[in-house]
Regions:
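Non-transmembrane, amphipathic alpha-helical segments
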Residues: 16-27, 39-42, 46-49, 72-82, ...
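C-terminal accessory extensions/subdomains outside the catalytic/core fold
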Residues: 169-211
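Long, charged all-alpha helical bundle/coiled-coil segments in cytosolic proteins
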Residues: 53-110
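Long amphipathic alpha-helical coiled-coil segments
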Residues: 82, 110, 142-148, 198-205
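Leu/Val/Ala/Ile-rich N-terminal alpha-helices, chiefly Sec-type signal peptides and the beginnings
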Residues: 1-68
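Long, contiguous binding/interaction regions
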Residues: 82, 122, 149-153, 157, ...
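A structural signal for well-ordered alpha-helices, especially hydrophobic packing surfaces
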Residues: 35, 39-42, 61-65, 87-94, ...
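Short secondary-structure subsegments characteristic of cysteine-rich extracellular domains
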Residues: 46-58, 138-157
Length: 211
C-alpha cells in the first residue's frame, strides 16, 4: 500500500500551510495593534504618528496576504480580514474627522469589500467619540458636520442587503452603528439647545447692562 507516500505528501502540504499561518497571524496582529494606536493618534491630531502607524499596518497586511497567497483556506480564516477591517476603520476615521471629503475606496486601501464595510461601520463609533471630544470644547458646528458624514455612511451600510456569509455579519455592525448615531444625535441636540440658551442669556445680559 502507498500509505507512506500519502502521509508524506499530506505532511508536506500541512507543513506549508502551517508556515504560511505562522507568518500571517503575527502580521495580522501587528496590523491590528498599529491601527488601534493610529486611531488614538488621529483623535489627538498627531497626524505624522497616525500616518506612520497606518503605513506600518498596511505593510503588515500585505506581508500576511503574501504569506497565504497559495493557501486560500488560510486566507479566509478571518484574522487577515480583521486586520483589513481595522485598517479601513483607521483610514475612514481620518477622512471623517478631518472633513477630507471623499472617503478612500476599497481599491484605494487594497482591502476586500466586506472588511472595508465593517471598518466603515466601526468608524461611525470613532466619529461619535470625536464628536463628544468636540462638544467638550464647544465645537458644535464641527460635530454636526461629522454626524452628517456618519449618517451618509450608515445609509450605505443599511443598503447592503446580502447574506452575512458574504458581508462578514455586517448587519450586526450596522445595527450598532445606528444606535450610536441616534445617541450622538441626542447629544448634539442637547449641545445645540444649550448653546442657543447661552447665547440668549448673553444677549439679555448685554441688553440689561446697556439700559
Amino acid at each position: 500500500m502507498n500509505l507512506d507516500q500519502i502521509s508524506d505528501d499530506v505532511r508536506i502540504r500541512f507543513d506549508q500551510r502551517m508556515e504560511a499561518r505562522e507568518r500571517a497571524l503575527p502580521a495580522a496582529r501587528r496590523a491590528i495593534r498599529s491601527c488601534a494606536n493610529a486611531i488614538r493618534a488621529i483623535h489627538r491630531s498627531e497626524w505624522d504618528q497616525a500616518h506612520r502607524l497606518m503605513d506600518q499596518a498596511k505593510a503588515a497586511i500585505d506581508d500576511g496576504l503574501s504569506a497565504v497567497r497559495d493557501h486560500p483556506e488560510i486566507r479566509v480564516a478571518g484574522y487577515l480580514q480583521d486586520a483589513q477591517k481595522e485598517y479601513a476603520e483607521a483610514r475612514i476615521t481620518e477622512a471623517v474627522v478631518t472633513g477630507a471629503g471623499d472617503l478612500p475606496t476599497p481599491e484605494d486601501l487594497g482591502v476586500e469589500d466586506a472588511p472595508f464595510l465593517n471598518g466603515m461601520a466601526e468608524a461611525i463609533g470613532e466619529g461619535r467619540r470625536h464628536i463628544l471630544d468636540l462638544l467638550r470644547h464647544g465645537e458644535v458646528d464641527r460635530g454636526e458636520a461629522i454626524l452628517l458624514a456618519m449618517d451618509d455612511m450608515y445609509y450605505v451600510l443599511v443598503s447592503m442587503d446580502y447574506p452575512d456569509a458574504i458581508t462578514m455579519n455586517l448587519r450586526r455592525s450596522t445595527d450598532v452603528a445606528r444606535s450610536l448615531i441616534e445617541k450622538t444625535r441626542g447629544d448634539l441636540s442637547i449641545a445645540i439647545v444649550q448653546r442657543q440658551l447661552r447665547d440668549a442669556l448673553d444677549r439679555h445680559a448685554k441688553d440689561v447692562l446697556g439700559q
